[in-house]
Swiss-Prot record:
The keyword ATP-binding applies. One of its GO terms (biological process) is L-arginine biosynthetic process. Belongs to the argininosuccinate synthase family. Type 1 subfamily. L-citrulline binds at residues 89, 125, 129, 177, 186, 262, 274. CDD domains: ASS. Keywords: Amino-acid biosynthesis, Arginine biosynthesis, ATP-binding, Cytoplasm, Ligase, Nucleotide-binding. One of its GO terms (molecular function) is ATP binding. It comes from Synechococcus sp. (strain CC9902). This is Argininosuccinate synthase. GO terms for cellular component: cytoplasm.
Length: 403
């Protein structure tokens, strides 16, 4: 008896998910495999996927357009939370996983499947993200994980697929594993597994090299409303168009490349190369506007909780209760994050050169100025310092008396 009758497989068109189709049928006795691929803005990469799955033995090959919810419901909350895992990675890949899992469960319900499956390996983050998200949304659904159990090496997996007429997508010339969506690209494997090897220019596609970036700088203005980016250089943009334009601007000037050693959920360190031009640009601008519009104690607390929010998303806990509670905090803080940030883009750098808010700024020039318009009561400082420093004076006196 097979492990399931009808399975919906999260499908990317890569080696592992393609091999999963015949493997589920031949080795695990699954009667029918339906694939689901999410359109997250990959572009031309999606074109051959539908037929590729059918050629591998899928009974149906479904592709769902998830670009708009991906940006509105996942990327924009990440911008409001200034989400940077370990202070650097803006979660471009991690943000996609809960959305794919959500739609995978919905498709399984629609077609009457008794299980879902994915092609994640046993040492990556995505297995955690998919399994935990599916368990959160549909604890009754069986999750099949052939790539975690089949025990084949990369070479053996490719050879298995070739038995069923699958061409190898990995060549000696291009040995990299690449994940792509509208927010960015993640590149790993091949020579990049040596952390001392510099990434060759050929692995980048969304950003220009510093040498190829324009010699002249470009100044832009990004406007935010309630923490969401809504316009660039005075032109209002819907969320998807906003990400595309931010990608174009930042990528042109070589902004958005990351090369980092990352701590995976499973406990190992991995070397990751990311291209996330637009997302990094928008987060930088958003952080700057918050410095102008949030009270000091709120800003400090939010910076601490941003790290926790980022960890939860990275660790696959998007649908968990703590993440939901933190969402409420983040949303409340954004009510007055309104204004404009001006940045200068040049040769890999985005430098903030101005920020302003007509209705939400907590910067009061008359209080900050040292000129004739200064309205700060300097005489009040003495009493404030006395009370502020009282615990220190009492502590110092106690030390002296104990000698």
């Amino acid at each position: 008896m097979g492990r399931a009758k009808k399975v919906v497989l999260a499908y990317s068109g890569g080696v592992d998910t393609s091999v999963c189709i015949p493997y589920l049928k031949q080795e695990w006795g699954v009667e029918e495999v339906i694939t689901f691929a999410a359109d997250l803005g990959q572009g031309d990469e999606l074109e051959p996927i539908r037929q590729k799955a059918l050629d591998a033995g899928a009974s149906q090959s479904l592709v769902g357009d998830l670009i708009q919810p991906f940006i509105e419901d996942f990327a924009f909350p990440a911008i409001r939370a200034n989400a940077l895992y370990e202070g650097r990675y803006p979660l471009s890949t991690a943000l996609a996983r809960p959305l794919i899992a959500k739609r995978l469960v919905e498709v399984a319900r629609e077609v009457g499947a008794d299980a879902v499956a994915h092609g994640c390996t046993g040492k990556g983050n995505d297995q955690v993200r998919f399994d935990v998200a599916i368990a959160s949304l549909a604890p009754d659904l069986k999750v099949l994980t052939p790539a975690r159990e089949w025990g084949m090496s990369r070479e053996e997996t490719i050879a298995y697929g070739e038995r069923f007429g699958m061409p190898s997508p990995v060549s000696k010339k291009s040995p990299y594993s690449i994940d792509l969506n509208l927010l960015g690209r993640s590149i790993e494997a091949g020579p990049l597994e040596d952390p001392m090897v510099a990434p060759p220019e050929e692995v980048f596609a969304m950003t220009r090299s510093i040498t190829d970036a324009p010699d002249a700088f470009e100044e832009i203005e990004i406007r935010f409303e309630s923490g969401n980016p809504v316009a660039i250089n005075g032109q209002s943009l819907d969320p998807v168009a906003m990400i595309r334009e931010a990608n174009r601007l930042a990528g042109t000037h070589g902004i958005g490349r990351l090369d980092m050693i990352e701590n995976r959920v499973v406990g190992i360190k991995s070397r990751e190369i990311y291209e996330t031009p637009g997302l990094l640009l928008l987060i930088q601008a958003h952080q700057e506007l918050e410095s102008l519009t949030l009270a000091a104690d709120v800003l400090r607390s939010k910076r601490q909780l941003e790290m926790q929010w980022s960890d939860l998303v990275y660790q696959g806990l998007w649908f968990g209760p703590l993440k939901e509670a933190l969402d409420g905090f983040m949303d409340r803080t954004q009510e007055h994050v309104n204004g404009v940030v001006r940045l200068r883009l040049h040769k890999g750098n985005a430098t903030v050169i101005g920020r302003g808010s007509s209705d939400s700024s907590l910067y009061v020039p008359e209080m900050a100025s040292y000129g004739s318009e200064d309205q700060f009561d300097h005489r009040a400082a003495e009493g404030f310092i006395y009370v502020w420093g009282l615990p220190i004076r009492l502590w110092a006196a106690s030390k002296r008396s104990s000698r």
